[in-house]
Amino acid sequence: MLFESQIRDLKMHLPWVRVRYEKTALRALDEQKRRIMTPEEVKEASHEIVARIEETQHFQNAKVVMLYYPILNEVDLRSLVTRYDGEKTFLLPATLPRHEMEVRVVHKDTKLVKGRYGVPEPPTEAYKGKIDLILVPGVAFDKNLYRLGRGGGYYDRFLRRY
């Protein structure tokens, strides 16, 4: 039999349990959808999204742009590095211990190395300067610019610093 205080505790935590479950379900659905995409579909979607990014004033005015390395059929933004290398400085994240990450400069000819989780990263030193535009991966975004990521919190912690 549950005591009154235990019932009160359960009621207080139920919304958080529901939110956690919904986030997990959204992440699973997103991963499932991305897994069934063909390479051609990923390439076409990436091309369309890159074109839209290039049209924005934010991108056009940015001198330093942070990207991400695409995994599991995420939108591939690497063509921006190829197209604008020398005109803009591009950064990619590198994972660190304690669920932290830093960013490093990448050029079109940079040879990437596998990072902590097998995701390619630049082997260069950490970039410490100003970042004008940060493009992040995400499962979902809302109109208030909140994002649902993959659940590790790397980008959340990183973005708090900017």
Residue locations for each model-derived region?
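Active-site beta-strand/loop microenvironment that shapes enzyme catalytic pockets
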Residues: D30, K130-Y162
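N-terminal active-site beta-alpha-beta segment that forms phosphate/nucleotide-binding
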Residues: L2-E4, D9, H13-G129
